[in-house]
């Protein structure tokens, strides 16, 4: 077990998406919350945990997103030229991860209320349980619109299914994907 799991951690922040559900021409992560771009709140927590080992994946309005990020921290960037999903965005960031990294945390750039303590707790649990992958999920009374977390009889994650692709049975699942992984 790693003595200090925070020592060799990198964080990837996904900020390349179009944010089409917001019905705005502005990149979703640039919308202001409490006078700052949404992504700046995520960066505060990420940098508190990983220092300068933070990689922001940019795409839509990349230059504006980079500008907003650099106003408040020293981070690296990876460009996702085509928005081809979360997995592809992570692949775009992988070359920027330092070789000394032992754990990678993946965050969405649109979770401004995420606290550094939550990230640390997720990582500590991930390391303690010696998992290959940890997904932060939440149970909602009304999960409409969210990706469902499908778990087998052994309590293992089998897949994440988006609402549009879910069967009626899967739509009844109340555990949803937060988009936060380790």
Segments and roles (model prediction):
Residues 2-6, 23, 48, 96-99, ...:
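Solvent-exposed alpha-helices and their adjacent loops that cap or buttress functional pockets
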Residues 30, 77, 133-135:
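Conserved beta-strand scaffold positions in the cores of enzyme catalytic domains, especially
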Residues 33, 78, 160:
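Hydrophobic residues at beta-strand termini and immediately following loops
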Residues 63, 73, 114-182:
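Conserved core of the sugar-phosphate nucleotidyltransferase
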Residues 9-33, 49:
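Glycine-rich N-terminal loop/short-helix segment of MobA-like nucleotidyltransferase
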Residues 17, 110, 152:
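Acidic active-site catalytic centers that drive phospho-/nucleotidyl reactions
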Residues 1-9, 37-108, 112-124:
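Conserved N-terminal catalytic core of the sugar/cofactor nucleotidyltransferase
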Residues 15, 58, 108, 137-138:
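Short beta-strand/turn micro-motifs composed of small residues
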């Amino acid at each position: 077990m790693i003595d200090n799991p925070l020592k060799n951690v990198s964080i990837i922040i996904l900020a390349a998406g179009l944010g089409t559900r917001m019905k705005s021409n502005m990149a979703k992560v640039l919308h202001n919350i409490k006078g700052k771009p949404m992504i700046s709140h995520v960066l505060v927590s990420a940098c508190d945990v990983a220092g300068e080992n933070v990689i922001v994946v940019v795409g839509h309005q990349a230059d504006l997103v980079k500008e907003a990020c650099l106003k408040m921290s020293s981070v690296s960037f990876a460009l996702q030229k085509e928005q081809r999903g979360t997995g592809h965005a992570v692949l775009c960031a992988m070359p920027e991860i330092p070789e000394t990294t032992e754990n990678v945390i993946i965050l969405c750039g649109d979770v401004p209320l995420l606290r550094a303590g939550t990230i640390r707790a997720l990582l500590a649990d991930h390391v303690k349980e010696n998992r290959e992958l940890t997904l932060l999920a939440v149970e909602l009374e009304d999960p409409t619109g969210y990706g469902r977390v499908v778990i087998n009889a052994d309590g293992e994650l089998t897949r994440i299914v988006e609402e549009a692709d879910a069967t009626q049975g899967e739509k009844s699942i109340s555990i949803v994907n937060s988009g936060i992984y380790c």
